[in-house]
């Protein structure tokens, strides 16, 4: 048998603490909502740059490779 160490006990407690359990209430929904909204804003900004509807000073978009 191996020895029990403080680090091993800590990692086991962290790794198995939430396995198979459902968090009551809203859980991670607010965090995932914020992440989803930030991703949406990022994608909209990329789309506006691609369509040249968002103009940036000193930044030209040339898709012809010239």
From Swiss-Prot:
Recorded topology in the membrane: Single-pass membrane protein
Localization per Swiss-Prot or TrEMBL: Cellular thylakoid membrane
Keyword Thylakoid annotated: yes
Record's keyword terms, sorted: Membrane, Photosynthesis, Photosystem II, Thylakoid, Transmembrane, Transmembrane helix
Main location: membrane
Keyword Thylakoid: yes
Subunit structure: PSII is composed of 1 copy each of membrane proteins PsbA, PsbB, PsbC, PsbD, PsbE, PsbF, PsbH, PsbI, PsbJ, PsbK, PsbL, PsbM, PsbT, PsbX, PsbY, Psb30/Ycf12, peripheral proteins PsbO, CyanoQ (PsbQ), PsbU, PsbV and a large number of cofactors. It forms dimeric complexes.
Family assignment from sequence similarity: Belongs to the PsbH family.
NCBIfam families reported in the protein's UniProt record: PRK02624.1
Protein name: Photosystem II reaction center protein H
Organism field: Prochlorococcus marinus (strain MIT 9301)
Designated gene of the protein: psbH
């Amino acid at each position: 048998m191996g020895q029990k160490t403080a680090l091993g006990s800590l990692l086991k407690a962290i790794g198995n603490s939430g396995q198979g359990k459902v968090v009551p209430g809203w859980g991670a929904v607010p965090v995932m909502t914020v992440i989803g909204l930030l991703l949406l804003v990022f994608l909209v900004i990329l789309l506006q740059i691609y369509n040249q509807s968002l103009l940036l000073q000193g930044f030209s978009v040339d898709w012809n490779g010239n």
